[in-house]
């Protein structure tokens, strides 16, 4: 900023601004001046563009007009939300000195920094979505990655071993803000991500990190958290914690532990798999028609966020899964009673975070009170549920009768938004406050009595007593009667049609009332702060309660979904394999207008790979995806859309389904396809579930076929993964004859004339034909193009039996499977009965056939 070059030429107020701005050069500074937050110089220009507000000038300082933009303090949340959504950070600078006693500019300081990853304000957060701050670190041995949800205190770290795993973690967590070291080598991994923040190297120093974390948790070492031997993760966590403290400018008591996320604890899904399975986001980037949209009927925002975390991190510990299954089964008869009560609990998790940060507002405390009021009813309903896990949740939930009583006494029923407006603390809670309020509230009665008395004394019927924010209390007399005003009336203000006066008695009362209002407000703020001190010692128990309530919400929701959508409880088995009876796609069955065709699936060590053939639109992709989604649902502990499911251990789910050009990275469809395939072949194991759809279609026929064949061979023979391999290369249906553990299945279609009906039913064996031209006709390709395609197909078939789709034995199949028109001569011959012809008739037929050829 050029303004700093001639610092001494500026006014004292602008010097103060420039000093504060120099401490936060990269971010916008909201500088409090009275009822406005002002921005100056480059900040003003940026803010005017980002917020679409007027850019004006404020006088001159150092001989130059100062660009300025301002926003009213009471509307600051709306403007902050806009800036945060655009990835901006804002330093909030408040007046902390008293203007009445200040010599020179009022003392100001930055009280907090609002950044996309550290927001906790309700207005700035998406209710049903986690908002994560993350830090990434890299050395020669791999990556370190840490995430913090400041609105709940959830602190996690991991150590992804390679680039693919790191990319998958970034996709899964989708941080709002990402801190990285200034020498970070893999910039291509994070380029284009929102909220990137470059940090100095020393912030990632391991010893500092250990010191910071021990200080935060009040421990001597980190052994108890299981992170002692995770140096890369700790480097990231140390930087992240320091950044959170710097921005919040306060202690963070709700961050009490850190958890190590290990690969072996959950089913790993790479970025492509999460995208293709449309877990919480569809391929178009929306939330409709996703797995979460079907499964998430939770009634609290914190429950919704927990369910989405479960969906993105399916657990492999069968003890946890069996416990969840048992709980869902036990709760099925109780959902109708529990859900309306749970809905009243609200977002206790985030309210507690704001309490810890001391930014909770009066309505937060009122909502907390309302949540506490639901606990007795919830505990009473759960008491009759015969399930140990449910009873454990009930205990963890607690009751907090004392805190409920405290908030019922302290906070009025419907408090205002902000404590600075007063009227938050209930009457009867504090005797001194009640006295000051009585004095302030008695003003109305006093003024009415004074008005009646003065009218009678003076005989002036236009006399009125009132109050004005600028001039205070006054006695008003119309211009026509003002000459009759008593001698002790001192003129205070002249209006067009009236005169306003003050008398010593009224002035004295005014001082008393204004003093009492000020004292009442100051005492109210003090009592409000003391409430925090009374609540915060219970923070740990309250956070446990919020976690239990969120988990209960998720499990009650899954119980309701299982009952409503006719799901069944899957069985876990020890050996790799998946056996599904009448499986359904959880999302597709909800959007179809007609009944969904359920299909079986059988994968086992003896039947590891299914080669899936059939027409386009026949349902191959749906069949494959539904298998992966059923597996994923089973591994969050949910019931699943099928009649019966048995499922073995799964370590990873891979999908190579569909592809689009990655133009931004300069990668073609085929390059994207091969990159994803390489990742699968390098990382899949015999416990992995692999979906491969149309491998090799992005290149020439023989190249594609060769690649598809080699990939299938590798997966079946070497890796031995559980694989669903969909293809249009009919040559691949020969694989079961050449290797063990491979089987053919197909999806059928029926033709009638020029129309085609897809049966969506999975049958054993290979498909007998393809239906490419029929699907093209169905899509509306012009008839002359279809006709020309048929001609070309016949030409190709006559040249080479392999040029188009072939049967397993190598003979050519018609893609449309409409037989060629029969020759009239052949038709006539077929209708002839040679034994019934006379010699004369036979000769006539020879001439007739000759003419037909």
From Swiss-Prot:
GO terms for cellular component: cytosol; mismatch repair complex; MutS complex. Disulfide bonds: none annotated. GO terms for molecular function: adenine/cytosine mispair binding; ADP binding; ATP binding; ATP hydrolysis activity; ATP-dependent DNA damage sensor activity; damaged DNA binding; DNA binding, bending; identical protein binding. InterPro entries: DNA_mismatch_repair_MutS, DNA_mismatch_repair_MutS-lik_N, DNA_mismatch_repair_MutS/MSH, DNA_mismatch_repair_MutS_C, DNA_mismatch_repair_MutS_clamp, DNA_mismatch_repair_MutS_core, DNA_mismatch_repair_MutS_N, DNA_mismatch_repair_MutS_sf. Keywords: ATP-binding, DNA damage, DNA repair, DNA-binding, Nucleotide-binding. ATP binds at residues 614-621. It holds the Pfam family MutS_III. The keyword DNA damage applies. One of its GO terms (biological process) is DNA damage response. Belongs to the DNA mismatch repair MutS family. This protein is involved in the repair of mismatches in DNA. It is possible that it carries out the mismatch recognition step. This protein has a weak ATPase activity. This is DNA mismatch repair protein MutS. It comes from Escherichia coli (strain K12).
